[in-house]
Structures are given as structure tokens and as C-alpha cells.
């Protein structure tokens, strides 16, 4: 199934998703997680994430032209770049010094429990925020839709 967003003039639209604080989502499955003990992981999954990144991925899956922007740490950006290339998402993130935020999910399927651990994010400077503001201004165009999503 393919969905295309069209205006009254039948021109295809572009959606810009803005994710100020994207995250690498690490999901670790551990059956019978025991706190204070050594546990053996069953699996590890790492995905590019953040609300706006997830929205962009879904839109791209439906064939909708999508641009992503926000602030992305230079360290840990590879998973995002790979996803954007694979899904043909136009990457316009402003790269900033530091590591992209990581969120760890510890999933215990035996108990049906999930524990979330959210790590700190790279700190944006005034120059980073000015660069993002300029990027947003450059992306503003008639017929473009913007989705602002996620945490600051």
C-alpha cells in the first residue's frame, strides 16, 4: 500500500520532522533479570530512535518524501545515517559535539517486565541552537509540513 499526501493542486508534499533530542535505542532481553547479579543477555537490538525519527521512518515506509532535522551528536550517529540511507530519508540534522543520547531497555520476557534507563544527552551550545534555527528557516517552504516531536 502506498500513501501520498497531496494538496488541492495535486502537488506532492514533503514532511519535515524535527527531533531536538534523538536517541539510540538499545533493547537488551534478559530472561529472569536478577538485580545485583551477573545476567546473560539473550539478545541486543540497537535502533535509531526519537519521536521525530520514528515518524520519519513510518512516513518513508509509505513512500512520503521526508526530511529529518534536529540536533544529532557526532558520536553515535552511524545508526541514524544507515537508517536514513536505507529508507531514503533526507538527513538534514545539525551535527553537534558529543555522543547521541542512548536509551537502554531491559526486557525480561519471563516476568513480562521492561525497565528503561535513559542516559544523558550531548549538551547543545548557543551556536548549535542558532545553527538549528537557521536550518529550520532554510527548510521552510510553501507546502511543507513540519512535525515537531520528542523531548528537549
Language-model region placement:
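Structural motif
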Residues: 16-18, 145-149
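Short, basic, glycine/proline-bearing loop/turn elements
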Residues: 38-43, 120, 149-151
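Conserved N-terminal subdomain of the carbohydrate kinase-like
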Residues: 37, 61-145
Amino acid at each position: 500500500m502506498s500513501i501520498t499526501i497531496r494538496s488541492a493542486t495535486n502537488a506532492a508534499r514533503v514532511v519535515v520532522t524535527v527531533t531536538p533530542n534523538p536517541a539510540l535505542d538499545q533493547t537488551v532481553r534478559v530472561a529472569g533479570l536478577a538485580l545485583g547479579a551477573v545476567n546473560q543477555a539473550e539478545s541486543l537490538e540497537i535502533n535509531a530512535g526519537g519521536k521525530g525519527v520514528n515518524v520519519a521512518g513510518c512516513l518513508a515506509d509509505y513512500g512520503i518524501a521526508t526530511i529529518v532535522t534536529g540536533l544529532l551528536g557526532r558520536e553515535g550517529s552511524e545508526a541514524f545515517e544507515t537508517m536514513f540511507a536505507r529508507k531514503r530519508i533526507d538527513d538534514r540534522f545539525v551535527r553537534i559535539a558529543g555522543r547521541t543520547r542512548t536509551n537502554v531497555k531491559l526486557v525480561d520476557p519471563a516476568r513480562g517486565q521492561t525497565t528503561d534507563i535513559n542516559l544523558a544527552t550531548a549538551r547543545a551550545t548557543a551556536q548549535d541552537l542558532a545553527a538549528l534555527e537557521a536550518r529550520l528557516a532554510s527548510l521552510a517552504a510553501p507546502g511543507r509540513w513540519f512535525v515537531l516531536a520528542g523531548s528537549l
